[in-house]
Amino acid sequence: MAENTKWHETLHDQFGQYFAVDNVLYHEKTDHQDLIIFENAAFGRVMALDGVVQTTERDEFIYHEMMTHVPLLAHGHAKHVLIIGGGDGAMLREVTRHKNVETITMVEIDAGVVSFCRQYLPNHNAGSYDDPRFNLVIDDGVNFVNQTSQTFDVIISDCTDPIGPGESLFTSTFYEGCKRCLNPGGIFVAQNGVCFLQQDEAIDSHRKLSHYFGDVSFYQAAIPTYYGGIMTFAWATDNDALRHLSTEIIQARFHTSGLKCRYYNPSVHTAAFALPQYLQDALATPSS
């Protein structure tokens, strides 16, 4: 792709967004997907896979803070964390900020994503790949959760949209495997798209997860990069009390953690579970 052109996202057929490309840093077809990293004056460095934006330097902190601190502070004493995907390293960066976490396992299907992001998106991982608690596994996430002998307190599925390599991370086989290796009282979270435009994905995830977990819901955050409104995150656990913790309890845990965040705070944490009525209605409608 030439510089000083416009890169158009291809996620939706009838509408979408574009980014001006100031400088292409890297573009290659890896073993699994088409990867491009380029610079944009408004959003900094941008990474896209198979024509869909995955992350930008400008607003990645919102996504990664909400995907990590919500489940970890709701759990309260997570020791072992599993990240599925997350090759850019930012999810790992946020998990390493929790000093009570003892082990962090990251399973990424595409070694190329890890390598190229370490080189071209260094601010995302911020040195977290060198954390002694961290273990990188290059493997398919579905295969890992169904075969590992390890168990985890929190599982974070930092998956792409349900197309290409990411499609398998929205299947019952994957969810069943996550339940299999999740400790009692554990929490599973996953990105689930922009619910206004991808409502069927939320409905499908809710239906499938409900077969394996006693409490299944969603929480939300506003992330400009993800076109179309509010980003939705799937939430699944067998302890329904964890979704209803008071702001005061979360505030106490947040204070003890010593975290300093740019988006996340205890009030945002509790408010994030308030879902718009159209999504509540859709989730309450029986599947045909």
From Swiss-Prot:
Write out the annotated subcellular location: Cytoplasm
Q: Which residues bind spermidine?
A: 64, 88, 158-161
Q: Which GO terms describe its cellular component?
A: cytosol
Class of the enzyme per the UniProt entry, highest EC level: transferase
Which Enzyme Commission numbers does its entry carry?
Answer: 2.5.1.16
Spell out the catalytic residues.
Answer: 158
Predominant cellular place of this UniProt entry's protein: cytoplasm
Q: Which gene encodes it?
A: speE
Name of the protein in its database record: Polyamine aminopropyltransferase
Subunit structure, as described in the record: Homodimer or homotetramer.
